[in-house]
Amino acid sequence: MISIVLGMHRSGTSTVAGILHLNKVIMGTYQSFWPRPLPQNPKGFYENYDFRIINDRLLNKVGYDAKSYESEIPEPLVSDKIKNAMVKIVQKYDTKYEHWGWKDPRTCLTISQWVTIFTELNLIHKLKIIFVTRRAIAVARSLKTRNDLPLEKGMALWKTYTERGLSFCEQNDFPTFYMSFEGILQSPEDHCEKMFDFLETNFDPTIVKHFVDKKISTSGTGEDAEIPNDISDLEFKIEKLLAVK
């Protein structure tokens, strides 16, 4: 099985990827996990740099730098050279691991290109999506703390990543599990039990209990900004998806 974690930066994707990896859903290796744990993610990012590099190449090909934090993002393009790299990394992990996946927020922008590779390699039947979300204002506050990004710019970026990820999920019929970072922090074991039921694999509740730090999020309160109507509408749409279990 291939489990891909989709979600905006600062939305809890590292927490979900860490829980998966510690429960034997291989999200990478020590060598490929980068960056190493930092103050904003003391338990690690569980971000597979091999996939992140390819995502950056896909975006750079159309002139976009993810670290610009601009919310106008072109559709990625795949060159033959990048396609070969994508095929190679997918085959490497799928040959070595029975249940694997990866997490990189940029995949919200590149997931369609990866699915093309899975289709060509006859691996599409293995794919499951875990979509992780968090309130736009909380993400924006976190980005302001980490990157000194204005709240309005952070919310605009949240909207682009979230819309692109959701649009992919809606336009395809891949098994998809929706979960929120707020929900994970409130009742981690309950939410993770549902996630592993979706994945049809066992998990260790004690790992979840010790891994999830309910105090890790400090951006639930803080500076406020007016929430644009389109973002409110998108959050309402997500709430309805979260309610379906």
Residue map of PLM features:
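Short, flexible loop/turn elements at secondary-structure junctions
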Residues: 7-10, 105-106, 136, 183-185
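PAPS-dependent sulfotransferase catalytic core
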Residues: 1-83, 211-220
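Distinct, well-ordered alpha-helical segments
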Residues: 110-120
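PAPS-dependent sulfotransferases, especially Golgi type II membrane carbohydrate sulfotransferases
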Residues: 1, 88-92, 151, 166-170, ...
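Short N-terminal targeting/anchoring amphipathic segment
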Residues: 97-104
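PAPS-dependent sulfotransferase catalytic domain
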Residues: 80-94, 112, 123-126, 133-203
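Structural motif
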Residues: 99, 128-130
